[in-house]
UniProtKB/Swiss-Prot annotation:
Species classification: Bacteria, Bacillati, Actinomycetota, Actinomycetes, Mycobacteriales
Cofactor(s) needed by this chain: [4Fe-4S] cluster
SMART domains per the UniProt record, alphabetical: Elp3
SUPFAM superfamilies: Radical SAM enzymes
GO CC annotations on file: cytoplasm
Keyword rRNA-binding applies: no
Domain of life: Bacteria
Biological or metabolic pathway of the protein: Protein modification; protein lipoylation via endogenous pathway; protein N(6)-(lipoyl)lysine from octanoyl-[acyl-carrier-protein]: step 2/2
Record protein name field: Lipoyl synthase
Amino acid sequence: MTIAPEGRRLLRVEARNSETPIETKPRWIRNQVKNGPEYQDMKERVAGASLHTVCQEAGCPNIHECWESREATFLIGGANCSRRCDFCMINSARPEPLDRGEPLRVAESVREMQLNYSTITGVTRDDLDDEGAWLYSEVVRKIHELNPHTGVENLVPDFSGKKDLLQEVFESRPEVFAHNVETVPRIFKRIRPAFRYERSLDVIRQARDFGLVTKSNLILGMGETKEEITEALQDLHDAGCDIITITQYLRPGPLFHPIERWVKPEEFLEHADAAKEMGFAAVMSGPLVRSSYRAGRLYAQAMEFRGEEIPAHLAHLKDTSGGSTAQEASTLLERYGASEDTPVVSFN
């Protein structure tokens, strides 16, 4: 393969990736779909108002569970990203002009969907002087303005580590400030060439110093070792990360990084236990966990761990903090049993 679907020539890394066939998923990478009344209501609202969410457009396997809790994720900044990560399906190309009306439209969508909790994520905008800091901040401000009973999580790029840009985002005061490290130092440059591991840790450190609840994510199965995962977890905790999600890499297509291994639920449980032992305020670990999965629940758990009262206008989120969730490793083990009999596939 030498030509991408959109007609351009493949990057060398894409050509190399395409030499490895798409991998077959193990038995524990499956989802149980349950359509509850809140999900059905959300679906009708989204269709009726022609709203757009990452949940639908990315085909997220957790949409039924998250929508049942009235949580949803929105992608801002356009369809093109100014950087390329080897695991990410978002198109890397020159971004579209900034749409200054987007924050209000997103806030109106949150209101129409009657969300309890919203996650905002988006593309990197190195083409803009402020790298998108105003956009990420304004979306939070507009959601809070129109939806005082909705929690907001802001999952942002690194803004090249520029303190003034980060400060602008901090001052919008999302309930959770999230920046995903995604992988371990040894393979970081190969997976995320336009980012820097230490810079990402510093972004989290600055947010924690500002007083925000902080969050990050690790994707497993891209070539890291168990020991490196533990070290990365410790790095994140030392940087002041409150909430950690841990997930399995699922390859979006042949042009993306091959899956190095399928991580078994037992190992996800080990990493969750290690993270809790380190002192993370909230942990979610499992193959189909995503960084925005049950985000309101994790925020409530983190606030309780920190000894802080959830604001009265968000008190309803307390009701989501207990019990197990469908995608946690412990739940998968109860559902499918031990996976030792299923071989770990390596594509090295």
